[in-house]
């Protein structure tokens, strides 16, 4: 199976079909549901979003969605709307695909939210995917961001298990702690909207479809 088809299998698969939650933004909220990821699947099928294997991502960056074009170290260009992932076969790889696909969905849907909340919500998706597939926690929740994302995911899973109606909201305390953890992580801190500039100033990634 090609990498593209593996990614599509994740986005149209049974785990994504179970993911649903809301998180607060300003005086409103953003809703994540299976349909969010299906938007990305349709864009991949149509060629609007490309799936490629990365060759030069920064240390500590396992995968990346490019909302704008970027130039590789060798001078070649990665097109805008390109998802760079190494694989989509193992459970952790699939969780990473879900994470990057949420970034793609925000871009395609032109969602208005700061980059820090965007990253935090993508980590919640990753944690939910790992928990729902039974991936042993030391395999993935081995850092502060992951530990906080796991706590946020647990509040959602508890609501799923109770059969709560509607789409559950992430716990406020867990959400705010996760956002702070993302903002202070060296990968994000001063590197763009995912860090303190997103948390404190509302800086956003490019969401132009």
Which residues does each predicted region cover?
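Auxiliary, metal-adjacent structural segments of Zn-dependent hydrolase domains
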Residues: 2-81, 85-90
